[in-house]
């Protein structure tokens, strides 16, 4: 049974994702994406009006993937929201073991774009959305200040990703998880 060939749009986005992850968004030109995806220039521009639109599509796809991985890891940790908060670090540990891991795509993109640009705004929106989700988990866990606990956990995630970008090792995610567990224990009273 033959599998269907991905659409031209999907090939372009997949190629751009790999290149942006490996070289950054400024380190990759449209001509390289066209050459490596095997599409004509007109095809790329039929799907993405400009490189900025392609970068936004990359960020949206990465957001969907990463938030899905976080949710899956949290749910796999069990029904207790305290365990789910610590479980997000399983997604981080798995990500750091992927070949070519270069840290957080959103942090990298923020560093390559001008504040106020669409891509920079999308990176900030992603970080806010993750913190909002963590805040809801912290609220469900009974944290006295859910937003503060979520902020601290998100900083642990970002710090572990930055460390693993320099030296990909699962120990960073494990250390961040243990630090998160201490914060969770302090912020969330034990349930009887």
Residue ranges and their predicted role:
Residues 38-48:
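Short hydrophobic/aromatic patch on the recognition helix
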Residues 64-71, 83-87, 116-141, 151, ...:
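Amphipathic alpha-helical packing segments from all-alpha helical-bundle domains
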Residues 84, 96-118:
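Amphipathic alpha-helical segments used for helix-helix packing
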Residues 1-23, 27-39, 53:
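Basic, helix-initiating cap at the start of DNA-binding domains
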Residues 8-16, 33, 58-62, 66, ...:
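Generic hydrophobic, amphipathic alpha-helix propensity
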Residues 119-124, 139-192:
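Hydrophobic/aromatic-rich alpha-helical bundle segments in the mid-to-C-terminal region
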Residues 57, 71-98, 150-153:
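Hydrophobic alpha-helical connector segments
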């Amino acid at each position: 049974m033959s599998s269907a060939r991905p659409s031209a749009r999907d090939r372009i986005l997949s190629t751009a994702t790999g290149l942006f992850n490996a070289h950054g968004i400024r380190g990759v030109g449209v001509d390289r994406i066209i050459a490596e995806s095997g599409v004509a220039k007109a095809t790329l521009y039929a799907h993405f009006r400009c490189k900025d639109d392609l970068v936004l599509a990359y960020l949206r796809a990465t957001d969907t993937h990463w938030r899905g991985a976080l949710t899956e890891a949290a749910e796999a940790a069990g029904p207790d929201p305290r365990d789910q908060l610590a479980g997000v670090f399983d997604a981080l540990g798995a990500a750091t073991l992927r070949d070519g891991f270069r840290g957080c795509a959103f942090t990298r993109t923020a560093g390559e774009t001008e504040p106020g640009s669409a891509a920079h705004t999308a990176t900030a929106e992603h970080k806010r959305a993750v913190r909002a989700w963590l805040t809801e988990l912290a609220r469900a866990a009974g944290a006295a200040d859910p937003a503060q606990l979520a902020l601290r956990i998100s900083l642990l995630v970002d710090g572990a990703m930055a460390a693993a970008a320099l030296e990909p090792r699962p120990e960073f995610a494990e250390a961040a998880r243990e630090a998160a567990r201490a914060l969770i224990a302090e912020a969330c009273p034990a349930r009887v």
